[in-house]
């Protein structure tokens, strides 16, 4: 089967705003008397804003202290902090090798999609000047389930009009790898410590079209 689509996660694959998310969550958590560190922040990668908040409240033993309206307000304020910090994002924030890979995929006439749980994904792609490379971006606001559920990757495949079996998914988080595998796509992991990735690369610098092409032909 010919490779028809490549679907990217955003944070940690195309750019790295994890530190901005962490700073925003850390401030919100501190305001309600919860301390979180960088190690705990690893458990928030690849999941939705609401699920991140739930885990923070659970971590601090305060899961029952906030009703749905109060939780929504906390999540809203976190997003305001995060969006404010995105003003420092420029084209230089694209991770190494990604822009050239996107150009190569376009030259090969392979559809490119985005499967990010971030509601700010369109804003980020625009700031990075990458929007033109993406045929379809899954709308996180329309999803019922967060990763590791495969819903977002299946939505991206549907948006591209290609079957999951003809796609590669690229992720840097365990929840994302699990979601890709559950969708029936081929999985590529970026970074160490990811289990189940069918191809594991140390960084985006190793993520090239020749490498993806060879991987596809050998699976």
From Swiss-Prot:
GO cellular component annotations of the record: cytoplasm
Example GO biological process: carbohydrate metabolic process
Cofactor binding: number and manner: Binds 1 magnesium ion per subunit.
Pfam families xref list: Hydrolase
KO phenotype (gene knockout): Cells lacking this gene are only slightly more susceptible to nalidixic acid, but are more sensitive to UV irradiation than the wild-type. No visible phenotype when grown on glucose.
Ligand binding (Mg(2+)): 9, 11, 172
Residues bearing PTM 4-aspartylphosphate: 9
Protein name per its UniProtKB record: Beta-phosphoglucomutase
Lineage: Bacteria, Pseudomonadati, Pseudomonadota, Gammaproteobacteria, Enterobacterales
């Amino acid at each position: 089967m010919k490779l028809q689509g490549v679907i990217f996660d955003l944070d940690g694959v195309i750019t790295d705003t994890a530190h901005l998310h962490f700073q925003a969550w850390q401030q919100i958590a501190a305001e309600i008397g919860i301390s979180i560190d960088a190690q705990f922040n690893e458990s928030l990668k690849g999941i939705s804003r609401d699920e991140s908040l739930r885990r923070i409240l659970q971590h601090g033993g305060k899961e029952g202290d906030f009703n749905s309206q109060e939780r929504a307000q906390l999540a809203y304020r976190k997003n305001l902090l995060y969006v404010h910090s995105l003003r420092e994002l420029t084209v230089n924030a694209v991770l190494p090798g990604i822009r050239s890979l996107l150009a190569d995929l376009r030259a090969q006439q392979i559809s490119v999609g985005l499967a990010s749980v971030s509601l700010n994904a369109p804003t980020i792609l625009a700031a990075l000047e990458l929007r033109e490379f993406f045929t379809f971006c899954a709308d996180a606001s329309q999803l019922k389930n967060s990763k590791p559920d495969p819903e977002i990757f299946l939505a991206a495949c549907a948006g591209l009009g290609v079957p999951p079996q003809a796609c590669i998914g690229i992720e840097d988080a365990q929840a994302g790898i699990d979601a890709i595998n559950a969708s029936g796509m081929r999985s590529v992991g970026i970074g160490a410590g990811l289990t189940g990735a069918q191809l594991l690369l140390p960084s985006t610098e190793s993520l090239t079209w020749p490498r993806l092409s060879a991987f596809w032909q050998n699976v």
